[in-house]
A protein has these predicted regions:
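Compositionally biased, intrinsically disordered low-complexity segments enriched in Pro/Arg/Gln/His
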Residues: 12-13
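Catalytic cores of the polymerase beta-like nucleotidyltransferase superfamily
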Residues: 20-180
Length: 180
């Protein structure tokens, strides 16, 4: 079924379908990957920052491919979440951050982890440089390049693992289509 959220049609996948997708995706995750997702979800909950696994990792796991780059969108301060997550690792890795863009990176074992605050981008007619402001998950998904990179998995306690697919990216993956 479809729902309208902020003027955008979202495909709300039936719970049983979402569970199958999540189960298939998680069965392909290593113990280290699952532990990492649980740590990040717990830290996000502690900071009261909704957090979503997005982009290439979600896409690649659905395709049963390996991926060591994990991207997280936070509806709130992604840099603060990165610092909180880094505290959970021994030894504690440094956090590289770019305050102007609200992004932070951690290298932990073989993983490259990026946190970004959800953002909205707009462009002036005379510029290719975006004007950036804080946004919602929906805003962040709208700015993504391809439908398959707008896929998101919730890390919230109440709906952990819920797939959010606003642009029908799962069907595009199955059809082997790259669509903007």
């Amino acid at each position: 079924s479809k729902a309208i959220w902020g003027g955008l049609s979202y495909f709300l996948l039936p719970t049983s379908f979402c569970f199958r997708i999540f189960a298939a995706m998680m069965s392909d995750c290593s113990d280290k990957e699952l532990e990492l997702l649980q740590i990040i979800g717990s830290c996000a909950q502690k900071l009261n920052v909704p957090c979503y696994l997005v982009g290439g990792f979600v896409r690649d796991k659905l395709l049963q491919r390996g991926c060591k780059d994990l991207d997280f969108v936070c509806v709130g301060d992604g840099i603060a979440l990165a610092h909180e997550v880094a505290k959970q690792f021994k030894p504690q890795p440094p956090v590289s951050y770019f305050k102007n863009f609200g992004t932070a990176n951690i290298k932990h074992n073989e993983f490259e982890i990026e946190f970004v605050g959800a953002r909205k981008e707009s462009y002036a007619s005379h510029s290719r440089k975006p004007e950036v402001e804080s946004g919602t998950l929906e805003d962040d998904q709208k700015r993504r390049d391809f439908t398959i990179n707008a896929l998101a998995i919730s890390l919230q306690k109440d709906d952990f693992g819920q797939l959010i697919d606003p642009f029908d990216g799962v069907n595009d993956l199955e059809a082997k289509i790259i669509r903007t």
